[in-house]
Amino acid sequence: MSIGVGVDIVTLNRVKDAIETAGQVFLDKVFTPWEQERAKQHSNPTAYYAMLFAGKEAIFKTFGIGWETGVKLTEIEIRDGNFGEPTPTLSGVFAELMKARGATKVLLSLSYDGEYAIAMATLV
């Protein structure tokens, strides 16, 4: 049973500009240390960051909440699963909200093409 659905799309240039403007401050605010290390290994780090950003925003939207709840995007970590699929792990406020809603996992799809990265998340 689906508890919540979220979709997000972002331009690669938006993420590139944020990295160029705020640098490590932006990276540390949005991405976990593991995600940052993984991005360095990617053939297109900007696209990788953009997909992760879209994924985190899509997951955020599955909860139907606002930022006043105190959530942080670093409370969502997206790693590669056994078959390369994006596998999110939630901690902090996100983990508490997930438990309160009776959800057991988040299904996530990420993609990019040209100048756009897109994500769809389902809370189940």
Question: What is the predicted function of each stretch?
Answer:
Residues 1-124:
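Core catalytic alpha/beta fold that binds nucleotide/phospho-ligands
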